Amino acid sequence: MRDTYSQPLARDAMAYVLAGGRGSRLKELTDNRAKPAVYFGGKSRIIDFALSNAINSGIRRIGVATQYKAHSLIRHMQRAWNFMRPERNESFDILPASQRVSEHQWYEGTADAVYQNLDIIASYAPKYMVILAGDHIYKMDYELMLRQHVESGADVTIGCLVVPRIEATGFGVMAVDTSDTITAFVEKPANPPGIPGNEDMALASMGIYVFDTKFLFDILREDAADPSSSRDFGNDIIPKIVRNGKAVAHRFTASCIRAAEEIEEYWRDVGTLDAYFEANLDLTDVVPKLNMYDRDWPIWTDQIIAAPAKFVHDEDGRRGMAISSLISQDCIVSGAIARRSLLFTGVKMGSFSSCEEAVILPYCNIGRGARLSRVILDSGVRIPEGLVVGEDPELDARRFQRTESGVCLITKRMIDQLA
């Protein structure tokens, strides 16, 4: 499909990733890191998905705007994304909020996070800008979205999901005509507009926008001069373009990278503990909807130098094994069992311990005889010998962060308070 053009449009584009959000609904999991820096899938970080999509789509100029507790995010990107080469017209810029426009002003909104760095963007002279949220899990070819943008002559093209209307109230929702030209855009409406010909479904914004660079610069400068603006794409920029220009919807089904043709598209907002937990466990399915084994569309991340995973002991009641689980490098499962779980790098499980439906972040240690069910362990947690979680809801709720569905988040501080 790409040979329609003499060269991919992605070569003329710059991806700009908005990665400054806290993600407060993830509770203590984001106390010390921004949401895009949260671990996912056994070895990656959430931001790796947007960045990998950009690289795999052919985009070689990338900027990442950071703000809230950005140290771990910046450190990760410096280690994992340092392979871009200026001599090949490639660039990777990390852009922390730094009062570049005003000494009293940090990033005030998503649009402002782009506006404050217009001079840096201009230095690369991209023809198109692809604005991305850095906190979603999905695979997508942005080149196909760029192509629709150019062919439609739109001022902005918005990536969108087809979702049931009853589920669309938490999104920015678009009303469209039969050609997918956007006629209205409303943030989190109580009564979302339906899709023509399929009124039970709605088009929800993915937080992905494609602009011609000149148009984007002009509208951001105009917005910056408006004292009533909240400096936000969803609240201010997009509704204004819908009223006064041409906005087009790009359906995710047209550019998603599927695990297989017969498998539905996969996109997840992992903004709550339950959503984060379930998206991780999705990867333990026999045929997961999100294919992390696809060498044609890999998820790039930091390649830590570490030993392979190891399973030891083979006795009745003390057999090191994992079933329907993802076990990362440097893990040791010593006479323990993991069922439908993800063990990130460097996890150690002591003899006679078990975990079932568990998301265990890097360098955790699970003591002998501990039993864990439906848990998220923050990185570096040391579970005491014999601790049981997931069998007594009232006790779990007093000691840990427990969701309504029974998922328990456990942090170092919570374990310290048990003593």
Curated annotation (Swiss-Prot):
Keyword RNA-binding: no
Residues that hold alpha-D-glucose 1-phosphate according to the record: Y107, G172, E187, K188, S205
Metabolic or biological pathway: Glycan biosynthesis; glycogen biosynthesis
GO molecular function (one): glucose-1-phosphate adenylyltransferase activity
EC number: 2.7.7.27
Superkingdom of origin organism: Bacteria
Gene Ontology BP term (one): glycogen biosynthetic process
CDD domains for this protein: ADP_Glucose_PP, LbH_G1P_AT_C
The reaction(s) this protein catalyses: alpha-D-glucose 1-phosphate + ATP + H(+) = ADP-alpha-D-glucose + diphosphate
Keyword terms, alphabetized: ATP-binding, Carbohydrate metabolism, Glycogen biosynthesis, Glycogen metabolism, Nucleotide-binding, Nucleotidyltransferase, Transferase
UniProt record similarity statement: Belongs to the bacterial/plant glucose-1-phosphate adenylyltransferase family.
Complex and partners: Homotetramer.
Role of this protein: Involved in the biosynthesis of ADP-glucose, a building block required for the elongation reactions to produce glycogen. Catalyzes the reaction between ATP and alpha-D-glucose 1-phosphate (G1P) to produce pyrophosphate and ADP-Glc.
Protein name: Glucose-1-phosphate adenylyltransferase
Species annotation: Novosphingobium aromaticivorans (strain ATCC 700278 / DSM 12444 / CCUG 56034 / CIP 105152 / NBRC 16084 / F199)
Gene: glgC
